[in-house]
Curated annotation (Swiss-Prot):
One of its GO terms (biological process) is keto-3-deoxy-D-manno-octulosonic acid biosynthetic process. InterPro entries: Aldolase_TIM (IPR013785), DAHP1/KDSA (IPR006218), KDO8P_synthase (IPR006269). GO terms for cellular component: cytoplasm. Pathway: Carbohydrate biosynthesis; 3-deoxy-D-manno-octulosonate biosynthesis; 3-deoxy-D-manno-octulosonate from D-ribulose 5-phosphate: step 2/3; Bacterial outer membrane biogenesis; lipopolysaccharide biosynthesis. Belongs to the KdsA family. NCBIfam families: KDO8P_synth, PRK05198.1, PRK12457.1. This is 2-dehydro-3-deoxyphosphooctonate aldolase. Its EC number is 2.5.1.55.
Length: 281
């Protein structure tokens, strides 16, 4: 099975290539914090030899509570992303929530992301696809992995085949998510790169009444399980003070644990991809 290669600058993204990290923080809390977080990611990924793309959101449009922090907004967020790109010479990924945002975001960001909850919204999908940008498609918590073919088809029909699929867990009763490891293989059959969003797979949606809970202590176990499937990349959020983060702190890795965490996953990815394929069908 031929695996498609998506290129972002000098980074090659494919299921049979060394894994790429989409990493950063959940939401832009401030310019200074974003710079601090990106600086540490750059230091660690350069040391470990992991291709890196900075990730953050300028707006969290689906917060549980109307009083929850959402972010600085698109205009201010794009200014921060531009500064990060200039300062650290790294690509940037962020999410798009409405069709009108697609074009201006794609002019600044190297990858635009289709949020899981919005992944079946055809107008949004088409608007994003028509930019020609690389798109990271989050699999909705309510979709089976094989249903991702319909979202891929919408993008392809709009003329865009620069696509990445991303697993972030499936609803399992109330306030819980699970990750079906068999789903990775199903999505890899579409030949597009597949990523694992380990951070949001650890969510307990609505678990704290007015916000999501999480299981940070299990991030290493779940990340190893996912990356053992031979994936194109990992999606990760970290924070210097997760307990006081403005969004999804319970799921975020502590920033000072980033290096030992990624070092283990790098070794695992190298090992898994050194194995020959065994055809068992």
């Amino acid at each position: 099975m031929t695996q498609k290669i998506i290129r972002v600058g000098n980074i090659e993204i494919a299921n049979d290539k060394p894994f790429v990290l989409f990493g950063g923080m959940n939401v832009l809390e401030s310019r200074d914090l974003a710079m601090k977080v990106c600086e540490e990611y750059v230091r660690v990924t350069e040391k470990l030899g992991i291709p890196y793309v900075f990730k953050a959101s300028f707006d969290k449009a689906n917060r549980s509570s109307v009083t929850s922090y959402r972010g600085p907004g698109m205009e201010e967020g794009l200014k921060i992303f531009e500064e990060i790109k200039r300062t650290f010479n790294v690509p940037v990924i962020t999410d798009v929530h409405e069709p009108y945002q697609a074009e201006p975001v794609a002019k600044v960001c190297d990858i635009i992301q289709l949020p899981a909850f919005l992944s079946r919204q055809t107008d949004l999908v088409v608007a994003m696809a028509k930019t020609g940008a690389v798109i990271n498609i989050k699999k909705a918590q309510f979709l089976a992995p094989q249903e991702m073919k319909h979202i891929l088809a919408k993008c392809e029909e709009a003329g865009n085949d620069q696509l990445i699929l991303c697993e972030r867990g499936s609803s399992f009763g109330y306030n819980n998510l699970v990750v079906d490891m068999l789903g990775f293989g199903i999505m890899k059959q579409f030949e597009y790169p597949v990523f694992f969003d380990v951070t949001h797979a650890l969510q307990m949606p609505g678990g704290r009444s007015d916000s999501a809970g999480g299981r940070r202590a299990q991030v290493t176990d779940l990340a190893k399980a996912g990356m053992s499937q031979g994936l194109a990349g990992l999606f990760l959020e970290a924070h210097p003070d997760p307990d006081n983060a403005k969004c999804d702190g319970p799921c975020a890795l502590r920033l000072d644990k980033l290096e030992p965490f990624l070092a283990q996953l790098k070794q695992l990815d190298d090992l898994v991809k050194s194995f020959p394929t065994v055809e068992t069908a």
